[in-house]
Amino acid sequence: MVTSTPVSDGRLEADSGNTDLLRKTGIVIPTYNAARYWDRLQAALDRQGVSCDQIFIVDSSSTDNTRKLARRAGYRIKQIPKESFRHGATRQMAAESLSWAEVLVYMTQDALPFGQDCIKNLIGAFSDPEVGAAYGRQLPREEANAIERHARLFNYPAVSDVRTFASRTQLGIKAAFMSNSFAAYRVSALMEVGGFPRNTIVSEEVTVAARMLIAEWKVVYQADAAVVHSHPLSIAQEFSRYFDIGVHHGRSRWLLDAFGGASEEGRTFIVSQLRFLLKNDPSLIPIAAFRNLSKWCSYKLGLHERYLPIAVKEAISSYRHFWEEERETLLAARPASGKKGQHYHLEPQPKKTGDERRPKHRFEGLI
């Protein structure tokens, strides 16, 4: 079986059925105070050849006029409490709401479709019936500095490729890389592997991609389907982001067991970044080195978060609501009675052993 198949012209040709499939495609965009992006986002979506009722906005109780703008555009809208947003559960709710769709495209509010065929090109990957998911290219914004530009060029090259479970021998965990900033899923494949994990802090798309690869679906990187999407993250924001990724990996050990770690990919990234900065902006090398060290430390901290009090995790993480919910769950699990002064650690319960931890079906344990 081919492990990772590049496509030399940078695209996977969409067949003549793409137009029909486009009409059976739902587009899901979670929003929160998206008004500042709206004009450009709506204009770009208008060029994609999809009708307004194919676009589903899941709004986390924005305090600006996001919902008013979405209603004016004719989009479907569902409002949820801000604190109830979860990366996996919210996207799964959207998938179940769009029961008519054969393909679901997920975007973020700040991902701007590039060109007029990016969605059609993305779903062109599904002309191969063995493809379960596809994700598109992310281009850096015009004002991005060299560090930000390199991150996008490294992770989203100009050449498409197809990944299978065998790709892990060459790519490690990168074989399951996906980004819901611009990704598409065959609904039947998504539901076959259990949908999006409902209780995950981040990386719900990586979990789904990994499950699909294990189930012998293919995952495609579609380079000719692009959005403009990059962020000028501060060091503190990156620290929180990589802490959360570490938490996800620490709580999803099956993922690392099945695909391996990311250490080799990390070394390749650092070498590539150094060469890019030497050529484009050497003055950024010291701050890039510090950022890389910070990301490594925060990832390792997240990987071993079980040793940290929840209050510390709340302070570090980007997703306070995740830890607040976990705190409530653990408090509810306290014994009804106990000795005065008895202390309970607000930490996850020990893993079950033996028959108790065996999944009831092949994907139940892949959380």
Map each language-model feature to its residues:
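Glycine-rich, basic loop-to-helix element that forms the pyrophosphate-binding segment
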Residues: 81-99
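Non-catalytic, C-terminal membrane-associated alpha-helical segments of glycosyltransferases
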Residues: 244-247, 258-367
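Short, well-formed alpha-helical segments that are part of the catalytic scaffolds
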Residues: 33-47
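Short, flexible, basic/aromatic active-site loop/helix in glycosyltransferases
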Residues: 136, 154-175
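A short, conserved alpha-helix in the catalytic core of glycosyltransferases
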Residues: 183-185, 189-194, 199-226, 232
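Short beta-strand-to-loop acidic/aromatic patch adjacent to the donor-nucleotide binding site
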Residues: 101-112
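A conserved acidic beta->alpha catalytic loop
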Residues: 59-67, 112
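Conserved donor NDP-sugar-binding/catalytic core segment of glycosyltransferases
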Residues: 112, 116-148
